[in-house]
From Swiss-Prot:
Annotated pathway: Carbohydrate degradation; pentose phosphate pathway; D-ribose 5-phosphate from D-ribulose 5-phosphate (non-oxidative stage): step 1/1
Protein name: Ribose-5-phosphate isomerase A
Lineage per the UniProt record: Archaea, Methanobacteriati, Methanobacteriota, Stenosarchaea group, Halobacteria
Gene3D superfamilies registered for this protein in UniProt: 3.30.70.260, 3.40.50.1360
GO biological process annotation, one example: pentose-phosphate shunt, non-oxidative branch
NCBIfam families for this protein: PRK00702.1, rpiA
UniProt family annotation: Belongs to the ribose 5-phosphate isomerase family.
Quaternary structure (record): Homodimer.
Function: Catalyzes the reversible conversion of ribose-5-phosphate to ribulose 5-phosphate.
Single GO molecular function: ribose-5-phosphate isomerase activity
GO cellular component: cytosol
UniProt keyword annotations, A-Z: Isomerase
Recorded catalytic activity of this chain's protein: aldehydo-D-ribose 5-phosphate = D-ribulose 5-phosphate
Amino acid sequence: MKQGGSDAAKQAAGESAAEAVEDATVVGLGTGSTAAYAIRAIGQAVDAGLDVVGVPTSFQSRQLARDCGIPLADLDDVSVDLAIDGADEVASGNLIKGGGAAHAREKIVDASADRFLVVADPTKEAAVLSYPVPVEVLPMARSTVVTAVEELGGDPTLRRAERKDGPVVTDNGNLVLDCDFNSIHDPAALASDLAALPGVVEHGLFVGMADEIHVGTADGVTVRTLSK
């Protein structure tokens, strides 16, 4: 598992992406420590008079947005102009997400946005995706999905909770399998294979979705614009 980068790098990336938020827009609010800096920066802009509405991707981001005074809406009621979200790993513009077990809701919101900005620190960059892919599964399908993932060449592990007995349970009431495929040279093919498995709610491969990558360092931010 990758260790997280410095708080300064995360803050730089989050605040850089938040600067892209314009007045009278709807913003998808991502999950994780780097996205949290973007949410706080948006909250400060709201305090200064910026007119935005947020669509949170998790219980965590909803609570933080409320604390920051950002008005919220459900995806059923608005269209998302811009989404800002973090990543567990970034390679060639593709992502692995789901370290916070919120990747199903994140993918729905991020995919619906007109523009999707990824915020990360340098420790999340890689030449090839290799981070274990989180796969959210229906509880009754855990065993069958484990077998299917193994047939695809993966090594699935049920994610255990750290502060309670038993497994992690997602905001949707499901379980998470962390599936190690070693180096993923064809993320699009693997994404298609995982999505086709009965019982899989969503996987953490975000392929061809990002429009910009904001990578923060202690000295500044590098912004890469991607072509789709």
